């Protein structure tokens, strides 16, 4: 109410950054500049642990431990992105059977059918991402690649120009 009376602002000053971000996103979407796909690693990205080494029962995901809660929250966030039209895909150095077992973990939020593509193999991740882009007929600039491993992120960023590769600070810890 203070800002209305002083400056005739129709909203709280704290709301302006959120509004500006929303307007910017609308403008970006009108010009086709939003990201369309999120490509995810599995081990230590969608769950804590390495499914091939720890087994499904050894993964940290779900309400039992704080680390597992964090991964479940991240999976919920990814599921919410899917619900608004973001395409989800997997790019993981894993045996496919292990990857699918991890994605079917009883405490997991995401399931194999949430992903349009699951590349769980031992090929370089940049090649898998290029294959996913080709299958979906999307340019690399439509993708975000999320991986806990800084070396994998660096390779993908160098080999797949245009893909967004955010640093997952703290993921290695």
Which functions belong to the PLM regions below?
Residues 1-39, 46-47, 52-53, 57, ...:
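Extracellular glycan-modifying ectodomains
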Residues 12-19, 66, 70, 95, ...:
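Phosphate/oxyanion-binding active-site loops and adjacent basic polyanion-contact surfaces
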Residues 22, 73-77, 128-131:
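Well-ordered alpha-helical segments embedded in enzymatic catalytic cores
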Residues 36, 84-86, 161:
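Loop/turn elements at helix/coil->beta-strand transitions in domains of secreted/extracellular proteins
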Residues 51-76, 161-167:
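Basic, amphipathic juxtamembrane/active-site segments
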Residues 69, 73-104, 118-119:
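Substrate-recognition element of Asp-dependent hydrolases with the DxDx(T/V) motif
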Residues 95, 100-173:
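C-terminal cap/substrate-recognition subdomain and adjoining C-terminal extension
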């Amino acid at each position: 109410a203070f800002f209305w009376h002083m400056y005739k602002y129709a909203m709280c000053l704290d709301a302006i950054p959120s509004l500006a971000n929303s307007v910017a996103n609308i403008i970006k979407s009108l010009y086709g500049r939003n990201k369309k796909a999120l490509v995810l690693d599995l081990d230590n990205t969608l769950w804590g642990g390495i499914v091939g080494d720890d087994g499904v029962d050894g993964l940290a995901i779900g309400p039992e431990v704080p680390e597992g809660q964090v991964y479940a929250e991240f999976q919920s966030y990814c599921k919410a992105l899917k619900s608004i039209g973001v395409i989800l895909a997997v790019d993981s150095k894993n045996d496919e059977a292990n990857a699918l077992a991890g994605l079917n973990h009883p405490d997991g939020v995401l399931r194999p059918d949430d992903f349009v593509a699951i590349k769980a193999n031992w090929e370089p991740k940049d090649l898998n991402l290029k294959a996913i882009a080709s299958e979906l007929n999307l340019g690399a600039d439509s993708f975000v690649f999320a991986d806990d491993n800084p070396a994998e992120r660096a390779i993908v960023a160098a080999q797949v120009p245009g893909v967004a590769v955010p640093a997952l600070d703290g993921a290695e810890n």
